[in-house]
Amino acid sequence: MDDLEKKEHLPMTDRAEENKQAEGHLQKKLKELDKESNTAEYSGLWAKLIAVICICFSLFQIYTGFFGALDAMIQRCIHLSFGISLVYLLCPTKRSWVKDGNVHPVDLALAVIATIPPIYILLNYHQLILRAGTVTPADAFMGVLGIVMVIEAARRIVGLPIVIVVLAFLAYGFFGRYMPGPLAHRGLTINQMVGHLFFTTEGVFGIPMGVSSTFIFLFILFGAYLEKTGLGKFFIDIANALAGWASGGPAKVAVISSALQGTISGSSVANVVGSGSFTIPMMKKLGYHKNFAGAVEAAASTGGQLMPPIMGAAAFLMAEFVNIPYMEVVKAAIVPAVLYFIGVFLGVHFEAKKDNLQGTPRSELPPWGKIMKEEGHLAIPLVAIIGLLASGYTPMKAALAGIIVSIATAMLRANTRMTFNDVVDGLIKGARGALGVLIACASAGMIIGIVTKTGVGLKLASTLVDLASGNFLLLLFCTMLTSLILGMGVPTTANYVITSTIAAPALLQLGVPILAAHMFVFYFGIIADITPPVALAAYAGSAISGGDPLKTGVNASKLGIAAFIIPYVFVLSPQILGIDASLTSIVITTCTALIGMTGVSAGMIGYMADKTNLLERLLLLAGGLLLIDPRLATDAVGIGILAFVLFLQLMRKKKNAKNI
């Protein structure tokens, strides 16, 4: 009898206690794997003080969302002041310093000091405008202090890799005159760097911070309220009703529920822990190996950052960088995201057929009608925000409306109704949930500042083109590797900023449409979460399943193989993103990509209509990959190869059935 079966036979009180312990274990694992979740918990006066700061932070963002953002520099300074002070309070210098629920004096002092530089800008705003370009000694001191405090905040809540990358760019800015060849520049003085990075909207307070202080925060707050309503449970219940009974049902439930959860969340690790605590034990119970069970949830949850309407934070940056409305990014992302989840679903289906894994008996599944009656109203805010974005409302207004609608719709039934404390708790959770992205955006702004001040972006782009000798596919491969390597330690936001300023221009030089180039680096930055050896989402999945993290990551990469193919598809065939495309071209490109993914997925798993031998696996992979190329000849050959393998398997299966 395994652990899950033992648990089912426990008395109710013991089972409740075990569930509580399991929840505590999962939260501990989440904090180990996701620095944004690894915050200290205080009690008494300090807990109340931090809650008040969080509430004021959220109310400020709601106010400016309703009545319009303040001047760019003022809005971003206030945003940073709130955020950075909370980081120093919630992410202590040493965990051992958090005693008796009190903030250590050192962390309190740092929290106060960190707010001084942005407040200095607020108090001297007009004087700074009048003496633009001139940096006084006081300015220099405050600028250096502000940069140092942002970097230390990044170390605390984002991680050491982003700090290393930022310091490398700062060093390049200062020591540029000593760099070899085309990378050399005349070098920047301390005053030049400080003036550009801290007292303009080109560095810390640049585009990433602007997006964080307007769109991203409100969408995170919207997600916090959707979570409070219980929408995540509704998604799992709906997925169970749709696919729980099918072959490999629990795994398909994980894919569908994670796809739905991805519409409101942008964190791979948090998604794994949230839905995986339910789906992974169910998969193990019905026969999935623990490594594969963790991999299914990791691959599905990582895809959540690709699923509109609320994608990863980098998607909002993409809209600004490409200079298009956010809704255009959403529209472009729909078909690739659906293809990704179909690819994961196919992998799960083939694995279930290969190992003859059954679904959950229908008698154990929640009735569809009952789910919709009791919880269906929870989807109204999601429908509302999609409708508002499609109608041309700004992301700020749409997110604000979504927050109001989510609270209002929760009141429609007693089982989902929010109390005043729930509403306040949503404000607190929203503010805390935005801190990691906020600091990542501030750090990414410094990277952009150095790139724009030194011109290194175009130099590196030209170098990439030269290294690839103008070979288009080789350049795409190099760009993919860059995004994956950065994504192993740098959060998606900073990863996207770096690759979009360095690698994306190289793709543009070879004629790739700007949206396709940016979407290409965006995708691979996210897929790093399931790419070994780091693969944070896979580590989270293995922590729940009890599997091996590396093997879980390998399985997750196999399941998520679609994500490695789709970016090549939309660079070679931009029609799939809706770029200069007719409905016919979109349908044809989507269908060929889907057939190709089916072949590759079957080849990776080792099953199509029957278990494959080595030759059939190689043919399936080759046929699927040929369909990436949009030319008619390669499509015809690819489809022919896949049809041939399918025919062989059907004949063999028929022959084996007769012999039984």
Question: Can you name each region flagged by the protein language model?
Answer:
Residues 236-304, 310, 314, 323, ...:
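Hydrophobic transmembrane alpha-helices that form the pore/transport pathway of multi-pass ion
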Residues 223-227, 258-267, 299-305, 445-448, ...:
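Transmembrane alpha-helix interface/packing and boundary motifs in multi-pass membrane proteins
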Residues 152, 157, 167-182, 190-194, ...:
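Core transmembrane alpha-helical segments of multi-pass membrane transporters/permeases
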Residues 137-141, 202-215, 241-255, 286-292, ...:
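Membrane-interfacial loop-to-helix junctions in multi-pass transporters
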Residues 1-133, 140-144:
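Conserved, well-structured core domains of diverse proteins
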Residues 50-55, 75-88, 106-115, 140-149, ...:
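Hydrophobic mid-bilayer segments of alpha-helices in multi-pass membrane transport proteins
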Residues 40, 64-68, 91-101, 127-128, ...:
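Membrane-water interface regions at transmembrane-helix termini and the short interhelical loops
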Residues 7-47, 331-433, 536-625, 653-660:
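Long, contiguous bundles of hydrophobic transmembrane helices that form the permeation core
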